[in-house]
Amino acid sequence: MSKATLVIMAAGIGSRFGGGIKQLAPIGPNGEIIMDYSIYDALEAGFDKVVFVIRKDLEKDFKEIIGNRIEKEVEVAYAFQELDDIPEKFSGKFTGRTKPWGTGQAILCCKDVVDAPFLVINADDYYGKEAFKEAYAYLTNLPSTDIMQICMVSFVLKNTLSDNGGVTRGVCKVDGHGMLADIEETHNIEKEDGKAVIHKEDGDVFLDIDSP
């Protein structure tokens, strides 16, 4: 059994990216894709299994570009995100749906290939080494309890802003005990003069640039 599994969400259509498959676009000096960096950092942190959540029509390209290569370094499994892979009590209620479900259903699709504490990441985001170290340390030191243990690795807002325009971020709110209370999807956050600002018709809104 795996000590800690890395689950990579890679089934998204990527319609805003254009005609190519965003998750498989090379960005490194030797043709590396973003997942190469995430997997390298995860293995270095201690993760010993990788699960790719993909669409069935991406399988061939996925294996040719990254899957077959990664299998030489670590145990690899695939989960296919299908529209009808939902709890039985909901089957038949969404027969006309064509849009893929979100992250929750994608994780559910992994139920037959994940048997250990796991970390979920996006295929097209860069996280950095420290994020994987923090997650692995948490996942491999869980208390003995029947209560489900969940964590989230957050990033300080100022470290996620761009010099090239506004970005969308999930801004977190925590309670007095440091526990996550809310996540608000916030659009068009810009970095100006060391501040995080959203320009609106009725005035500028400033965010705490040191918030998670």
PLM segments and residue spans:
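N-terminal glycine-rich phosphate-binding loop and ensuing alpha1 helix
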Residues: 2-67, 71-76, 81, 116
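Short beta-strand segments
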Residues: 9-10, 77-79, 120-122, 149-156
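A short, conserved beta-strand element in the Rossmann-like catalytic core
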Residues: 14, 126-128
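Short N-terminal binding/cap micro-motifs at the start of the first secondary-structure element
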Residues: 14-18, 87, 161-162
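Short glycine-enriched, charge-decorated loop/helix-capping segments at active-site entrances
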Residues: 21-27, 92-97, 167
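Short phosphate-binding loop-to-helix
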Residues: 70-117
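Short beta-strand-to-loop acidic/aromatic patch adjacent to the donor-nucleotide binding site
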Residues: 116-126
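Conserved core of the sugar-phosphate nucleotidyltransferase
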Residues: 129-212
